Design a protein with these regions (language model features):
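Conserved ABC ATPase "signature" region
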Residues: 12, 24-32, 103, 123, ...
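Conserved catalytic motifs of ABC-family nucleotide-binding domains
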Residues: 177
Length: 332
């Protein structure tokens, strides 16, 4: 697998020294004369490999080390320890050939110039990456069509909606046709329709150009829609690297059964068929063990006045919350 890896991290570690300062004038003087530090272990011994064309989700709570890892893989931070190769280059050397092959999109940062049309930023990026005029027009046309931005690129960025600005940010970041995309919360703050549009674009871009993508997101719908494989990081340590289905099977040994009944029933009448999570009128939601699911569904159909029944995976948010609540179980 490592021979095929486009992104390779080996024992990647980043520690920060954070200065400690007491309040008050005396504390300021002590801080100036006898400065003390606290060591923050942001990332500790992270290793993984990503093959060409993979879309991998990178999950973790705030402060887990996701963004720090991305910054090391894009060369913005030098690691305290460890090695990395991205598209055949050591990231923190920041070689010109390396920068042409990668891009980093952060949902809380922007490169578009606020008071100018997005097209001006695109032309600036084209000059930086030495994209010929003919190729520039072709790429802008392709990406604008994929993103639904036709007619929007000549408006000042400040007049675009949040969703349109994020799409324009993606267009600017992908103008040089990078091989490896690092997407850090690309749907942050977007409404549901804009989130779906960005997800569909990422899927289409990966299919059309075979790009390798490492995606962080707090919106589990992004991960479920785009990623078959996930990395889970917590307190700077990698807890899980594998299939999303494997994570679900390990931390959600149950399926969700949604029922529409012919008449309302009390919660007590449903307890014999599974763990009752919700009852509202004629609708109910039960958790049923994966083992023996078929038999349990047959009992439900036989013992309850069912008008409609749907079996689903539990919400990914619930599964991830369980992972972070019991990290030792993941490591074990």
């Amino acid at each position: 697998m490592r021979l095929e890896a486009v992104v390779l991290a080996q024992d990647l570690t980043k520690h920060f020294r954070v200065a400690l300062k007491e309040e008050s004038l005396l504390g300021t003087l002590r801080h100036f004369l006898f400065r003390q530090y606290r060591l923050v272990r942001a990332v500790e011994g992270v290793s993984f490999a990503i093959r060409r064309g993979e879309v991998v989700g990178f999950l973790g709570p705030n402060g887990a080390g996701k963004t720090t890892t991305l910054k090391m893989l894009t060369g913005l931070l030098h690691p305290t320890r460890g090695e990395a190769l991205v598209a055949g280059h050591v990231p923190w050397r920041r070689e010109k050939a390396f920068l042409r092959k990668i891009t980093l999109v952060m949902g809380n940062k922007q490169q578009l110039i606020w008071d100018l049309p997005a097209m001006d930023t695109l032309r600036l990026n084209a000059a930086i990456y030495e994209v010929p005029e003919g190729e520039f027009r072709k790429r802008v046309g392709e990406l604008a069509e994929m993103l639904g931005l036709e007619g929007k690129l000549h408006q000042p960025v400040r007049k675009l909606s949040l969703g349109e600005r994020m799409k324009a940010e993606l267009l600017a970041a992908l103008l040089h046709r990078p091989e490896v995309l690092f997407l850090d919360e690309p749907t942050l703050g977007l409404d549901v329709n804009a989130q779906v549009a960005v997800r569909e674009f990422v899927r289409a871009y990966n299919a059309r150009y075979g790009a390798t993508i490492l995606l962080t997101s707090h919106y589990m719908a992004d991960i479920a829609a785009l990623c078959e494989r996930v990395l889970v990081i917590h307190h700077g340590r990698l807890l899980y690297d594998g299939a999303l289905e494997g994570l679900l099977a390990r931390f959600a040994p149950y399926r969700e059964v949604r029922l529409v009944l012919a008449k309302p029933l009390p919660r007590e009448a449903l307890k014999a068929f599974g763990e009752v999570r919700e009852v509202e009128g004629r609708e109910a939601r039960l958790l049923v063990p994966r083992a023996g699911l078929t038999e349990r569904v047959a009992l439900i159909l036989k013992g309850l006045p069912v008008e409609d029944l749907e079996v689903k995976e539990p919400p990914l948010e619930e599964v991830i919350a369980r992972v972070f609540q019991s990290p030792k179980e993941v490591e074990g």
